[in-house]
Amino acid sequence: MLAYWFLFALFALPALTERMRHPDDPRPQRLLAIFGVVMALMIGLRFHVGADFEAYELIFRRAAEIDLARSLQRGDPGYQFVNWAVGQLGGAMWQVNLICAAIFVWGLIRLCRAEPSPMLAALVAIPYLVVVVAMGYTRQAVAIGFIMAGIASLSRGGSVIRFALYVAAAALFHRTAVLVLPVAIFAGRRNH
């Protein structure tokens, strides 16, 4: 439990002083990246944490034993590919989790940087999105990571096509991600 409080405090302390800093100060952006690495390590290096941990271990063992074509037919191709590649390289399940955690955190940090208070945005994500979703549901977390990166792209003026590509990447890890595509319809509209 102490590890979760540590992660929360890591983002909470800088979030308290975030508004007092000059907008051009690069330190908060670097700090967010460093803390993102810590977050990815905590998510990726977890052991027997999460509702589907045993199922994911079984997926990994099976993917490592078969050829790529058969592995991709067994489920979400992005997740199957990561499992297959790590298995072929002689890796372990924790490496799959770490790769997936890195993708999730990358998307989260991209989205947080698009917000006025990035540290606060990351802090708000920790109790549920990080601890429950990212540590409990690996495939969904990767899909959400790509979706968050897509939303960040849209908020910075990125094209709807780019957003759709992020959603397509998300769907490689969890097919339900395609349900987010209608968000693109509202991308050009602004409330004033």
Residue ranges and their predicted role:
Residues 1-192:
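Terminal, non-globular segments
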